[in-house]
Swiss-Prot record:
Protein name: tRNA dimethylallyltransferase
UniProt subunit comment: Monomer.
Gene transcribed to yield this protein: miaA
InterPro entries given in the database record: Dimethylallyltransferase, IPT, P-loop_NTPase
Site (Interaction with substrate tRNA): S99, R128
Length: 294
């Protein structure tokens, strides 16, 4: 291959994992490397749809404690080791996942983002909890007008991050993002899977029910038993906040399932818009089965 590093990305539930399974069956000289910010956590393999641990072809899955505030910078360090190891062993590295920040940092270089104090993080978290979505959005917009048209009301995670940065530093998050380090690699080919939304939404709904049946509730019980801070990334994985509310008796299980499905569909919708605009050099396909890599 001219480009000896492959990136397979796309929205959640687009078929990335199934495609990688098929590639493993068909070829023996590949290494599948995770690019999903929640699939790194050891305690939540079911609710984050991680591949089986015994699968030797898969790297950077389920190897970080949920106690850790794992970052894109740490992931890039781990990724570099795995990619170089694969290349040294005549394997083709296939980096796959849907975390936009991870992929953007890999392709464009890591932004020099500031450290956020626990005080600011806690204050923003309280605001996010106590304000309505509209109120929280208006607050963030009043502090950082540059988010208009770039960060939207339903994207509470990115709104929180923007508010944290402007509060901590007095500078817009977009000012920080403009200052990037050089990318780790430039010899890659990127594929983006963007299926029909209706198909993705159906898969999201059925997949979450399967996760519940396979033990997702027990995973969340374990997280609660660890007394983790609510701002930690593992506590924000899709489905975790909704199951926590169910376990605390605030909502029924049916309500938790419905809310988690709805929130994940909204996330997929935002991903769809983001991926269409971000990687103009990517080969875009609407079905994982149509992807021809080799």
């Amino acid at each position: 291959m001219k480009n000896n590093i492959v990136i397979i990305t796309g929205i959640t539930a687009s078929g990335k994992s199934e495609l990688c399974d098929n590639l493993i069956e068909k070829y023996g000289n590949i290494s599948i490397i995770n690019c999903d910010s929640k699939q790194v956590y050891e305690e939540i393999p079911i609710i984050t749809a991680q591949p089986p641990k015994q699968e030797v072809f898969y790297k950077l899955y389920g190897y970080v404690s949920a106690k850790e505030n794992y970052s894109v910078g740490l992931w890039l360090e781990d990724l570099e080791k795995e990619v170089n190891h694969a290349l040294e062993n005549a394997q083709i590295p296939i980096i796959t996942g849907g975390s936009g920040l991870y992929i953007s940092s890999l392709i464009k270089g890591l932004s020099s983002m500031p450290q956020i104090s626990q005080k600011v993080r806690k204050n923003v978290s309280e605001l996010r909890k106590n304000l309505s979505k509209e109120e929280f959005y208006k607050l963030a917009l009043s502090k950082d007008p540059r988010i208009q048209g770039k960060v939207f009301m339903n994207d509470s995670h990115r709104l929180s991050r923007a508010l944290e940065v402007i509060t901590e530093t007095g500078k817009s998050i977009f000012v920080w993002q403009e200052n990037r380090q050089p990318p780790l690699f430039n010899n890659f080919k990127i594929y983006t899977i963007l299926p029909k939304r209706e198909d993705v939404y159906r898969k999201i709904n059925s997949r979450f029910i399967t996760m519940i049946e396979n033990g997702a509730i027990d995973e969340v019980k374990k997280l609660l038993s660890m007394n983790l801070a609510p701002h930690l990334p593992a506590m924000k994985a899709h489905g975790v906040p909704e199951i926590i509310k169910y376990l605390k008796g605030e909502i029924t299980l049916d309500e938790a399932i419905q809310i988690a499905q709805t929130n994940t569909r909204h996330y997929a919708k935002r991903q769809y818009t983001w991926f269409k605009k971000q990687f103009l050099n990517a080969e875009v396909i609407d079905c994982a089965n149509k992807l021809k890599i080799f």
